Amino acid sequence: MTTSRRPSPRIRSFVKDLSATIPGAFRFTRGHYSMEELAREAIIRGADRIVVVGERRGNPGIIRVYAVEGPERPDNIVSFIVKGVSLSRERRWGLPSLRGGEVLVARPLDSGVAVEFADAFVIAFHARLKPPEAAGYVEAVIESLDARTVAVTFRYGGAPVGPMLRLGKPAEMVKRGRRV
């Protein structure tokens, strides 16, 4: 998980929150790395996804998820428009103390656009739609706000953790040819 080339302090805090909340994610300081160099770094670290948070007026504006299949330029597979962010420190929530082995579970609260976002979370973050029996998990609770917008709250052990997001659906959220 990384940022655009010259991130604002708020973007850096957001990436820190999000990488601490999503199981298996790690934060990488981008610097002047190109996408190809990010792909090579991901392969070295054993990752198959690169998450890049873009900026809009100093705030998170878009989350792009890329699939890493080799050292060449990664493919953009999922994009989310960020309409609003509330960082964990602003809500006085903590970050989860993940022990390893946890998974991300996407739980839509209603049908329609929340289900579309849950499917996109499965593709982007290897989330599951049902919690596992034995392992711990971080739950991404996805609630529809209107026909194109959802609110995402992360929970660990039933308590809210990490950032709270309002995400919008771009014209093409899941890129062609990608299925759950």
Curated annotation (Swiss-Prot):
Entries under InterPro entries matching the protein: Brix (IPR007109), Brix_dom_Rbsml_bgen_prot (IPR023548)
Lineage, broadest ranks: Archaea, Thermoproteota, Thermoprotei, Desulfurococcales, Desulfurococcaceae
Entry GO MF terms: rRNA binding
GO biological process, alphabetically ordered: rRNA processing
Keyword Metal-binding found: no
Species of the source: Aeropyrum pernix (strain ATCC 700893 / DSM 11879 / JCM 9820 / NBRC 100138 / K1)
Job of this protein: Probably involved in the biogenesis of the ribosome.
Segments forming domain Brix: 1-178
Alphabetically ordered keywords of this record: Ribosome biogenesis
Name under which the protein is recorded: Probable Brix domain-containing ribosomal biogenesis protein
